UniProtKB/Swiss-Prot annotation:
This is Probable L-tyrosine/L-aspartate decarboxylase. One of its GO terms (molecular function) is pyridoxal phosphate binding. The gene is mfnA. It comes from Methanococcus maripaludis (strain C5 / ATCC BAA-1333). It is an enzyme of class 4 (lyase). The modification N6-(pyridoxal phosphate)lysine is found at residue 233. Its cofactor is pyridoxal 5'-phosphate. The lineage of its organism: Archaea, Methanobacteriati, Methanobacteriota, Methanomada group, Methanococci. One of its GO terms (biological process) is methanofuran biosynthetic process.
Length: 384
């Protein structure tokens, strides 16, 4: 085929994809990347962080990005990597937990909430972890009293806890402050999955925070061992750009495997070949937007979230919980049926597992007119 014919054929396939800016994607935690990412992607498209000695500049950028992420998570000594996404980040954290537990001759018993991302189910299967599921509170967060009692019971040997800061379905945040105290007092590891919340909570204005709700989640809490944070969600980086950060580089030895034929003789990430595009794009976008830019981005998303909730209630819909961040769960006893009917009209929402509700993620690509159009379609769908 000629080059132009190839491109024309590819455009036909691409035209079948949904576009973020059209406003029909309401259930994804990803969004249209910042425009500067196009230029950066072209500059770094051939780089491979799997062999960092060949790409010294890109490798240095990764260290800078980890430092920048560490800074917004209150840790100037953070160690980690920019990887494929939240799934790989969570798998990496669980792999470290497993290897640390083995080194201490402890059982691999880990407390993980029902609201956790499905990547932890993959980790359980791959690593043969024994998972304890604590009950949830009315706010869909883990019952801290149950966890404390369970951990302190001498019969239950727990090696780690997973807390969620912005759960995939509802946006709820576990009480990481109390979980951190339990982790410190009992010498156990605590991983925080802030794949979504990591680029929301640090920039969230107090006026959007729920009263009586604890938003603390990062390395400012002494018990936090590791954090998942994804730049390709609210960070506006292109896919794939996920992040895993550990408190310090003492965790590296629990991840390293020998890689004698590479320029560096050990490798810690699950995926070997890693494009530098995610690293470079994250660096550029974070430098361009800065703290103020992300604050504006989050505040705009929260204003749209408030609008969605207000309009939904005018139509007679109720939320499963008051939104903790820019994720809304609208109660629906026939969620799967409603979801499929909406899809027939080209609206793509998702459903919650832990509650009978539709799930809408108010990402930056959504505009007020998209939200209003969706709610009108939802209302019409429920009439029939």
């Amino acid at each position: 085929m000629e080059e132009q014919d190839i491109l024309n054929e590819l455009r036909k396939y691409r035209s079948q994809d949904l576009k973020y800016e059209e406003g029909y994607i309401l259930g994804s935690m990803c969004t249209k990347p910042h425009p500067i990412a196009r230029k950066i992607s072209e500059m770094f498209f051939e780089t491979n962080l799997g062999d960092p000695g060949l790409f010294n500049g890109t490798s240095k950028l990764e260290k800078e990005v980890v430092s920048m992420l560490g800074s917004i998570l209150h840790n100037n000594n953070a160690f980690g990597y920019i990887i494929s996404g939240g799934t790989e980040a969570n798998l990496t954290a669980m792999r470290a937990f497993k290897n640390i537990s083995k080194s201490k001759d402890k059982k691999q018993n880990i407390i993980i909430p029902e609201t956790a991302h499905f990547s932890f189910d993959k980790a359980r299967d791959m690593m043969d972890l024994n998972v304890v599921r604590p009950p949830l509170t009315e706010y869909f967060t883990m019952d801290v009293k149950f966890i404390r009692d369970y951990v302190e019971d001498s019969k239950n040997e727990i090696s780690g806890i997973v807390g969620i800061a912005g759960c995939t379905e509802l946006g709820s945040i576990d009480n990481i402050y109390e979980l951190s105290k339990i982790a410190v007092e009992n010498d156990i590891l605590l991983h925080v999955d802030a794949a979504f919340g990591g680029f929301v909570i640090p920039f969230l204005d107090d006026k959007y925070k729920l009263k009586g709700y604890n938003y603390d989640f990062d390395f400012s809490l002494n018990g936090v061992s590791s954090i998942t944070i994804d730049p390709h969600k609210m960070g506006l980086a292109p896919i794939s750009a996920g992040g895993i950060l550990f408190r310090d580089n003492t965790f590296k030895k629990y991840l390293d495997v020998d890689a004698p034929y590479l320029t560096e003789k050990q490798q810690a990430t699950l995926i070997g070949t890693r494009s530098g595009v995610g690293v470079a794009s994250t660096w550029g976008i974070m430098k361009l937007l800065g703290i103020e830019g992300y604050e504006n981005l989050v505040n705009e998303s929260m204003e749209k979230t408030k609008h969605l909730v207000k309009k939904a209630r005018e139509y007679g819909f109720e939320t499963a919980i008051d939104p903790v961040m820019n994720i809304v769960a609208l109660k629906d006893e026939n969620k799967q049926d409603t979801c499929m009917k909406l899809r027939e009209e080209n609206w793509y929402v998702s459903v919650c597992r832990c509650v009978e509700a539709l799930r809408i993620v108010v990402m930056p690509h959504l505009e007020i007119e998209h939200i209003d159009g969706f709610l009108e379609s939802l209302s019409n769908t429920k009439k029939y």
